[in-house]
C-alpha cells in the first residue's frame, strides 16, 4: 500500500492546438520513490513532467505536489516550484556566469538568500555533484557532463521535495553519461523523490522503484522494473521493450 503520495496527478489532459498529447493521465508518487517513465518519442513523457510543475498548463485535470494544488489560481507558482527541482536535457545554464553563479542565482532571486548564504549553499550543492573545484568555471570551460551536474546542483541547492529529470543524459557523449547517473544514484540514496524520463534502461532496471510505460498520451502499463522489462502484460509494452533490447 502506497503511503500518502507527495505527487498526485488526476485526469491530466494536454492539447497543443489539435494535437492531444496527454489523454487522461493519472500518476501517484510516494515520498522517496524513484519512478521511471519510458516510452517512444511523442508519447507525452516530457509533457507530463512539464505539466507537473506548470511549465505547461494542463488543459484539464489536477496536480497536487507536497500538498500544494499546482493549478489553483491562488497558488504562488514561483514559491511552489521551489519544492520541485527540474533538470532538462539542454542544461539551460547562463553561459556568462560561473558554475557557482548559475547555482546561486535562484537562491538569491527566488529564495531570497544573501550572497554569503547563497554562496555557501551553492558550494555545498557543487560539492555534492563533485564539482566544488569547478565553481569558478563558466559553462564553456566544462564538459557536457559537468554542465549537467551543475544543472543538478542548481536544482538541489533549493532543497526541493521532488526532482524531475527530463532526459538528462540524452544530449551527452556516451562516456560522460556515467558521471551524471552517479549523481542521480547519490540523490536516490539520500532519499530524494524522483521522476525520471530517460532512455537509460540499465539505470531504470537497477535504481527505479517503479516504471511507467507511456504511449500515445496514456500510461499503458506500470510496475516494478523486473515486471516491465522481463514480463510486461501489455502487447504494446512487449513490442517496445523488445525493440530497445535488440538495439
Residue ranges and their predicted role:
Residues 1-3:
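The identity of the second residue at the extreme N-terminus of proteins
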Residues 5-225:
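ABC family nucleotide-binding domain
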Residues 222, 226-247:
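C-terminal boundary and immediately downstream tail of ABC-type ATPase nucleotide-binding domains
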Amino acid at each position: 500500500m502506497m503511503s500518502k503520495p507527495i505527487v498526485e496527478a488526476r485526469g491530466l489532459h494536454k492539447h497543443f492546438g489539435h494535437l492531444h498529447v496527454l489523454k487522461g493521465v493519472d500518476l501517484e508518487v510516494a515520498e522517496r520513490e524513484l519512478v521511471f517513465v519510458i516510452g517512444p518519442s511523442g508519447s507525452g513523457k516530457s509533457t507530463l513532467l512539464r505539466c507537473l510543475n506548470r511549465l505547461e498548463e494542463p488543459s484539464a485535470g489536477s496536480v497536487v505536489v507536497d500538498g500544494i494544488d499546482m493549478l489553483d489560481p491562488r497558488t504562488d507558482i514561483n514559491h511552489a516550484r521551489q519544492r520541485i527541482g527540474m533538470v532538462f536535457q539542454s542544461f539551460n545554464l547562463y553561459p556568462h556566469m560561473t558554475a557557482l553563479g548559475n547555482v546561486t542565482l535562484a537562491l538569491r532571486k527566488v529564495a531570497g538568500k544573501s550572497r554569503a548564504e547563497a554562496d555557501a549553499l551553492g558550494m555545498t550543492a557543487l560539492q555534492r555533484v563533485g564539482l566544488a573545484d569547478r565553481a569558478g568555471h563558466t559553462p564553456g570551460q566544462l564538459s557536457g557532463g559537468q554542465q549537467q551536474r551543475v544543472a543538478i546542483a542548481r536544482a538541489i541547492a533549493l532543497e526541493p521535495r521532488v526532482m524531475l529529470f527530463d532526459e538528462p543524459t540524452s544530449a551527452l557523449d556516451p562516456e560522460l553519461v556515467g558521471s551524471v547517473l552517479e549523481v542521480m544514484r547519490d540523490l536516490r540514496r539520500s532519499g530524494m523523490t524522483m521522476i525520471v524520463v530517460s532512455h537509460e534502461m540499465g539505470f531504470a532496471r537497477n535504481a527505479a522503484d517503479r516504471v511507467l510505460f507511456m504511449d500515445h498520451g496514456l500510461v499503458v502499463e506500470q510496475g516494478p522494473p523486473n515486471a516491465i522489462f522481463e514480463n510486461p502484460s501489455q502487447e504494446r509494452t512487449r513490442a517496445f521493450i523488445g525493440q530497445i533490447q535488440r538495439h
